[in-house]
A protein has these predicted regions:
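Terminal helix/beta-alpha structural elements that buttress the NAD(P)+-binding lobe
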Residues: 1-208
Length: 208
């Protein structure tokens, strides 16, 4: 379908182009459409060096937000290079003990629950997740009616307007995709195994 077509930006190669659409659509939905991020907002991104998280950092910075990112020790430098203003090593630091509160918390991993995040959200803050459990999906909207600090789940679908916006952001060097490794088609099992193990930055690409 036409709405599902992603036209390759002219300033990047095909491998990088393949790594961008899905994660950028998800990050765009979370930060621009749901959170309506604005200049000066304080944003926390859990999993800031993964596929969605790495693009989310760049989108948030392009909007003028102050970005804190959570990642592992090995990826601290990568997170800084993405533009994160503050980087938290989850292996040695506890974000819940930091003396700072956020306008938006984006959890792309699934291990920073809304019940935990409430203590570091501002009074009108918003928690957004791309990795909610089924119970959260079923009961979250009902519970939110009674809460000032709302929690939202990202439900994503392609559309040509957003893809066009993302293409422009890439061409204006506001966001870039990061390819951790490119696999040949015959190495699909190896790619799947690495995907299941995790621990890499950005995305894996399968070359047809």
């Amino acid at each position: 379908k036409e709405k599902d077509i992603w036209l390759k930006p002219e300033n990047i190669e095909f491998e990088e182009s393949a790594a961008i659409p899905l994660v950028a659509l998800t990050a765009h939905k979370a930060l621009i459409e749901i959170a309506q991020l604005s200049k000066g907002s304080y944003v926390l991104i859990n999993g800031c060096t993964g596929g969605v998280g790495s693009v989310a950092v760049q989108i948030a910075k392009s909007l003028g937000s102050e970005v804190s990112g959570i990642c592992s020790t090995n990826n601290l430098e990568f997170a800084k290079n993405l533009g994160a203003d503050h980087v938290i090593d989850y292996k040695t630091e506890n974000v819940l003990e930091k003396p700072i509160s956020y306008d938006v918390i984006l959890d792309t991993v699934g291990n920073l629950k809304y019940s935990q995040s409430k203590k570091i959200l501002k009074p009108a803050g918003l928690y957004v997740t791309t990795a909610a459990t089924i119970p959260a999906m079923l009961f979250g909207p009902l519970l939110n009616v009674f809460r000032q600090k709302k929690a939202k789940l990202v439900m994503n679908s392609p559309n040509s307007k957003t893809l066009s916006e993302i293409k422009s952001m890439v061409e204006n060097n506001q966001i870039r995709g990061h390819v951790s490794k490119v696999f040949k088609l015959e190495d699909v099992r190896e790619a799947h195994d690495l995907s299941e193990r995790g621990g890499f930055t950005g995305k894996l690409v399968l070359k047809m």
